[in-house]
Amino acid sequence: MAKPSYVKFEVPQELAEKALEAVEIARDTGRIRKGTNETTKAVERGQAKLVIIAEDVDPEEIVAHLPPLCEEKEIPYIYVPSKKELGAAAGLEVAAASVAIIEPGKARELVEDIAMKVKELMK
């Protein structure tokens, strides 16, 4: 299946799993914002340290604005394959199209590592 138009780079499975792990750790020891509206606000305010976007969002327009907004605000972002998995990592019983890590807590080093690897992928 072709990737949606808002997916600007390929994320290795291992890195996507690290991103989900970072969301879980930040949920427990830091602060996250769940859902596209909260994520968008966190990016616009410059609060987000890392934005995680699901690749299976339909319609695409729900999250299509996030990659250019993150680039404008110089906030790293990464894709994960499943909105269901992203929702679960964020502690929700429903799917989440996107999540923003505001304070990574104990996931700080992991978030920094992911941000560095994402910069490499975007080149």
From Swiss-Prot:
Statement: the UniProt record of this protein carries the keyword Secreted: no
A molecular function GO annotation: rRNA binding
Annotated GO CC locations: cytoplasm; ribonucleoprotein complex; ribosome
GO biological process: one example: tRNA 5'-leader removal
Keywords: Cytoplasm, Ribonucleoprotein, Ribosomal protein, RNA-binding, rRNA-binding, tRNA processing
Keyword Acetylation set for record: no
Pfam families noted in UniProt: Ribosomal_L7Ae (PF01248)
Annotated compartments: Cytoplasm
Family membership noted in the UniProt record: Belongs to the eukaryotic ribosomal protein eL8 family.
Protein's job: Multifunctional RNA-binding protein that recognizes the K-turn motif in ribosomal RNA, the RNA component of RNase P, box H/ACA, box C/D and box C'/D' sRNAs.
UniProt cross-references to PANTHER family, sorted A to Z: RIBOSOMAL PROTEIN L7AE FAMILY MEMBER (PTHR23105)
Subunit description: Part of the 50S ribosomal subunit. Probably part of the RNase P complex.
Protein name, as recorded: Large ribosomal subunit protein eL8
Taxonomic classification: Archaea, Methanobacteriati, Methanobacteriota, Thermococci, Thermococcales
